[in-house]
Curated annotation (Swiss-Prot):
Protein's name in the database: Solute carrier family 2, facilitated glucose transporter member 3
GO molecular function, one term: xylose binding
Modification sites for Phosphoserine: 471, 475, 482
Chemical reaction(s) catalysed: D-glucose(out) = D-glucose(in); D-galactose(in) = D-galactose(out)
Gene3D superfamilies in the record: MFS general substrate transporter like domains (1.20.1250.20)
Topology within the bilayer: Multi-pass membrane protein
Amino acid sequence: MGTAKVTPSLVFAVTVATIGSFQFGYNTGVINAPETIIKDFLNYTLEERLEDLPREGLLTTLWSLCVAIFSVGGMIGSFSVGLFVNRFGRRNSMLLVNLIAILGGCLMGFAKIAESVEMLILGRLIIGIFCGLCTGFVPMYIGEVSPTALRGAFGTLNQLGIVVGILVAQVFGLDFILGSEELWPGLLGLTIIPAILQSAALPFCPESPRFLLINRKEEDQATEILQRLWGTPDVIQEIQEMKDESIRMSQEKQVTVLELFKSPSYFQPLLISVVLQLSQQFSGINAVFYYSTGIFQDAGVQEPIYATIGAGVVNTIFTVVSLFLVERAGRRTLHMIGLGGMAVCSVFMTISLLLKDEYEAMSFVCIVAILVYVAFFEIGPGPIPWFIVAELFSQGPRPAAMAVAGCSNWTSNFLVGMFFPSAAAYLGAYVFIIFAAFLVFFLIFTSFKVPETKGRTFEDITRAFEGQAHSGKGSAGVELNSMQPVKETPGNA
């Protein structure tokens, strides 16, 4: 197998795919900045309809629904990934669901003109479904078009798209840009533009060669696409691996979500996939970002919105750092470093918030702890859970596994968003100790259960888990970690 290169075709395909990740990040962060203005819109609209001032409880419920319905849509979308990718393919699925994004964007963008609370909530639900689908499509497509030696680095671009989307939403949400009383519908409806751009660019991207060969038996087209994407004529080894996997798939029926839970062969990789997704959300990162303005305000920052944007910049910078580290240090190592660093920062956040009234310097300690916490998140728990799921499963169960992992991520995101305010009100600064405890648990789990997938082919990883299932031992992680990874030489990639 020839040495794979970073070709313009590969970069273009991955970049276009990550527009879906950008959409997820943008729509996650876009609702926070105009909170007060949207509440005023809800109040005005209900007053006109009810001919009386709405109760405060009703306003709070509707606002919470506007925020939380996005995660409900994400759960629905993420669980529907397999329905699309097995029927339409990876690329065509991304193309089709942009229609959903455009519909959701239009509903949100015209909600104010129509004076319709229902349009706003329905738009958030629909855009959530779209983003849930994207969290499955994008990592799967990137993992299947990337060379083994570059799979981790390109997989990190999925997370980079998410954090750039969050940052853009924070900046555009400033009151002198689009976060004003007149322009906030444009802020929400802006999601239409990336959807149109991706729809225009996707026809120029290739379909996943693994899907073409394994699912459609189109070997010649898969070979041509691999040669073009990887910049080498010698892709015999990769094609043979796909053919072997295709033979194995033909001997067993397509894997459904239910069969994924029933089969002993899939138990260990599925457990790892779900726990890693939980480690991302129960690390507390979204709680910090959802309520970062208030946290910075409590810490004594005069303009907390700019401190929040600063945290978003740190978020983006360290995602880029992770991109360069992931193929050197490995997924497992970076994930453990990230979890450990976040646990320490959570303790420092608790201590500094408790002592900030007594010691002025503690406000500075709190801000630094938050920024370092965000940096550690993007080194490991941010990017790695998304793309490692695609690495742990072969072609047959991969769509179902992505659906289960994505749904667990969205569900845990929803739970954190729902219960963090109550927990913070009851526990105060001690709430971050809960996240520290979760982080320590996930660190121990990763140490004992998660294999290092750096430099492994999909076949290597799958065989290790199958061997573990047949032997009845929980040793796949140890077995993979003790193997020598595939190295880049003139004879392989």
